[in-house]
Structures are given as C-alpha cells and as structure tokens.
Amino acid sequence: MDLVVDLGQSGARIKIDNQISQLQIAKLTTDSVVETLEKIFKLLPQAQYSNVFLSLTGLLGNVGDVAPYGKLCEKFFNADQVFVMDDGLAAYLGALGEKNGVVLTLGGGVVAVAGNNGKFGHADGKGQIFGDFGGGFWVGQQGLRRAISTLDQRDDAHDLVKLLSAELESHSKLQNKTGVDAATLCISAAKTVIQGAENGVTSAQEILKTAAKFLGATVIAAWSKVSDNTQEKPSITFLGGLSRSDFYTDLIRQEINQKLNCEYV
C-alpha cells in the first residue's frame, strides 16, 4: 500500500491507494516542513505503507537532506521507501512531462517552474513574507487591506467593503490578527476577490490586474533561467485553485504575451 502527500500553503491532499482526501493543514511560516508533516501523519491511518511519496512546498527547488523525512515516515508507517520532491517540480512533470515550458502554480502561494531539455529553473515561491505575489494569500491580503483601510477612512474601496463583508466579520473576531488564522483568512478571501472581479467589482479587478503583472513577470523570469533563445516557443500551463478563474488566467496571458511567444496547454 502506498501513501502520497501533497503539501501546499493552503492545505494538504492525501492519496492512500486510490482514495483521495483533503486536510486543512497547510505549510505555514511558523512550522518547518517536517513539523507540518508530523501534524498530518498523526491524523492518517497508522498502517504500514511500502512507499511514501512526498510533494512538498517550501523547498525552493532543493530537497536538501532527506534523512528527516525518511526517519519520520519510518516512525509513523515503517515505510520501505520514501520519495521526496519539490512540489513545483512535481507539478511541472505532471503537467508538461517532457515538453519544454513553464508551469505556473497558483495556490495560497506562487511558484513558476521552467524546464528546457532537462534544465530546470524556479521563479518566486519565496513565501508570503518575501514573495508569492499574485497567489491566494497576496490577493486576499490586498483585498482585505483595502477594505479595512476604507473602514478606517484611509481608502475609498467601498466596493471591497461590501464584497468582503463576511471576511471582514471574521477578521473582527480574530483574537490574533497577525497569526496563522489571519493568514488563512487572507487565503480564503482570495476566492471572494476573484469572484468579485469576475462580476465587475472595480477594485477587485484592479487587484487582479496588478497581480497578473507580477505573475507574467514570474513566468518570464522562470523561462529566462533555462533559455536565452528567443526563437524557442515554450508551452505554458497554469495549475492550482486560482487557475480555475478564466478571468484571472486571461489577464496573466495578456501579460505573458507581451514578452514571450508561447503556446498554452
């Protein structure tokens, strides 16, 4: 029996044989990857798994010393083999296989992984404090910041106050407005901001247009790390929950198309 754990910044997906489930345990800045995995493993069936496959956020393309992962899987599952991969690279191989191009993953965070004839490059994936512009945390944070500033009479985004009324109520109830729950609220608010943009909310559209500029630059940066040949035509694909919005991905395509001749798959 095999176990697959896909750990991201907005949650974790678990696959045990052919059964797939979700856990609301995400990689946050307060815990290491190993600490987060231990929280997840404590909630899983304590069976013996022959193979454990770990697709992990926060590795920045370098899995480093795999011994801590092996020890953890041996402790909980007595696993025979443990396979560890950066989640961005895993996404690339799953989406493009042997094609040359860029995979932009839009979840709670952001990472672009480019591949060209066996050479790989990353852009962004720097986490919520130093990067991940255009990801779920960033989009939701921008929306809530402007709405809160409007309530404080420092801004005039009244359309966002109306749009994010439920999230603002949740914000008012937070005991710690700089902790894990606050970060989770930002990520969940991104969906509301995107829906608002799709429905014509001007301030929400402004947020996504700015985000798309960042994301376009992220894709270009990733590709430039593996190719300086302007004649090459890379394949581009988008993954992650935010990529389900055609409105958002169309904005990102517009930014990419200004600087890169590519095809979308």
Where are the regions a protein language model picked out?
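Glycine-rich phosphate-binding loop of actin/hexokinase-like ATP-binding domains
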Residues: 99-150
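ATP-binding/phosphotransfer module of carbohydrate and carboxylate kinases, centering on a glycine-rich
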Residues: 1-51, 97-102, 144-265
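Short, acidic/small-residue loops that bind anionic groups at enzyme active sites
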Residues: 78-86, 131, 262-264
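Conserved strand-to-helix beginnings and helix N-cap segments that scaffold or border functional pockets
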Residues: 34, 63-67, 136, 249-250
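Short glycine-rich anion-binding loops that position phosphate/pyrophosphate groups of nucleotides
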Residues: 10, 57-59, 108-111
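Glycine/charged-rich beta-loop-alpha catalytic/anionic-binding loops adjacent to active sites
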Residues: 73-77, 120-127, 255-263
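Conserved phosphate-binding catalytic cores of ATP/NTP-utilizing and phosphoryl-transfer enzymes
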Residues: 79-104, 119
